[in-house]
Design a protein with these regions (language model features):
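Structural signal for conserved beta-strand scaffold positions within catalytic alpha/beta enzyme cores
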Residues: 26-28, 78, 135
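Canonical P-loop GTPase G-domain recognition
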Residues: 109-160
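Short acidic active-site motifs
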Residues: 12, 91, 143
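Conserved C-terminal guanine-recognition region of P-loop GTPase G domains, centered on the G4
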Residues: 62-131
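Nucleotide-state-sensitive switch-loop elements of NTP-binding domains
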Residues: 1-73, 85-87, 96
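Residue-level signature of catalytic and energy-coupling elements of molecular machines
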Residues: 6, 58, 105, 120, ...
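Conserved NTP-handling cores and scaffolds of large molecular machines
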Residues: 11, 20, 44-47, 67, ...
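Conserved Rossmann-like nucleotide-binding pocket used by diverse enzymes
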Residues: 3, 103, 134
Length: 160
């Protein structure tokens, strides 16, 4: 199941729902820059947790506010792409400090954008030396095995 967070729309939830039979529950924050535990708890009312093996919570899409809120998640995951610049960890240190894994996306664009992967990793590890990295490329199917392995490993340590 998936709980999505969005400031004004449920567009992300609608897009996901078109591609899965699993329940996708939208939380619209009406201007707030993050989800909070109460909102997630209310969204869970619509989900049959007994029949759910895995729950993803997609917080509102910024790297500032969501870092400060405990939603009961097993692990915080931060996604950033090569198109955003390797200085993201320096600009948003709290998110990278709180994250257990960073997923670097759009690696297939490296030939076309100025991005130094080693610098990005070094910047992130300055604020979180134990941060795990997964490198992905949707066009080349790169990194998905590592992502799935992380999910299996993390889901095996269920927090009740």
């Amino acid at each position: 199941a998936v709980v999505t967070g969005d400031v004004q729309t449920q567009n992300d939830a609608d897009r996901l729902a078109r591609h899965t039979e699993r329940l996708v529950q939208a939380v619209v924050t009406n201007g707030a820059c993050h989800l909070d535990a109460r909102q997630v708890n209310e969204a869970l009312d619509a989900i049959d947790l007994e029949a759910t093996d895995l729950l993803f919570i997609e917080n509102v899409g910024n790297l500032v506010c969501p870092a400060s809120w405990d939603l009961g998640e097993q692990a915080k995951v931060v996604l950033f792409s090569v198109t955003e610049g390797e200085d993201k960890p320096a600009k948003y240190p709290k998110m990278f400090r709180e994250a257990r894994v960073a997923v670097l996306t759009k690696l297939d664009l490296l030939p076309y954008v100025p991005f130094d992967v080693d610098r990005a990793v070094a910047e992130a590890r300055r604020v979180n030396s134990g941060l795990e990295f997964i490198f992905t490329s949707a066009l080349a199917d790169g990194g998905l095995a590592e992502w799935f392995a992380f999910i299996r490993r993390t889901a095996g340590a269920v927090r009740v």
